[in-house]
A protein has these predicted regions:
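Active-site rim/loop-helix segments in enzyme catalytic domains that contact anionic ligands
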Residues: 1-88, 116-123
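Metal-dependent de-N-acetylase/amidase catalytic core
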Residues: 66-218
């Protein structure tokens, strides 16, 4: 929607998808799959009218790996996210909230790290952070998204709503279609139908409200 109307939109992808093997694609885990996923991300950005994506290249499903060094690899991700934001100087950053949409561990962790960058003061001054959400009244009877449960955000927190039209919908479906190593056409149609049900013409967001608002608990 915004890209079509002249706004500069940049998609930043934290992980490289190398472990996301799908039987139908016949691509083994590793470098070959990571390369395909990178090409798919570029294809998807083009369909959306966005700038070429920024690929941070962290190993898929590796953000939650235990390390003898506290904070690794999330500290490295935090540093890269802060550097990327300060290079791009966006007005708005969109990411997953604490629930990660449908609970994906990398989605949860990336959203947490982005929030950490903001609350530490490392994000550019004036940049605002929003989390995409699913309203409870839509999740109650929602179709399964890739066979998984989606997690709601309370309606009163979803204070920003961005409407989309048929042109936006068509662009989003073409963008989804770029990710052929991740899902079959039938699976893509199923997931797109789920998102259509969950959002029903407008995407809701919760704004991060960082900063002190009260000096006492009571």
């Amino acid at each position: 929607h915004y890209a079509r109307n002249g706004t500069r939109v940049v998609v930043v992808v934290a992980t490289d998808g190398r472990m996301g093997v799908s039987e139908h694609a016949h691509i083994p885990a590793g470098d070959s799959l990571a390369k395909v996923r990178a090409d798919e991300a570029r294809c998807s950005a083009r369909q959306l009218g966005a700038q070429p994506p920024v690929l941070l290249g962290f190993e898929d499903a590796g953000l939650a790996v235990l390390s003898p060094w506290p904070g690794e690899p999330l500290d490295r991700l935090s540093t890269r996210v802060a550097a990327t934001l300060n290079e791009l100087h966006p007005d708005v950053v969109l990411t997953w909230g604490a629930e990660g949409g449908y609970g994906h561990q990398d989605h949860r962790l990336v959203g947490d790290v982005v929030t950490q960058v903001f609350q530490s003061g490392a994000a550019p001054a004036g940049t605002r952070l929003f989390y995409v959400g699913f309203p409870p009244e839509r999740t109650a009877n929602a179709p399964r998204w890739y066979g998984m449960k989606v997690y709601p955000t309370a309606t009163e927190y979803l204070t920003t709503h961005i409407a989309y039209d048929q042109t936006d919908r068509d662009a989003a479906r073409r963008a989804l279609g770029c990710h052929r190593s991740q899902a079959t056409d039938a699976e893509m149609n199923e997931s797109f139908s789920a998102l259509e049900h969950l959002w029903a013409g407008e995407v809701p967001f919760q704004q991060w409200r960082g900063g002190p608002t009260a000096s006492k608990f009571f």
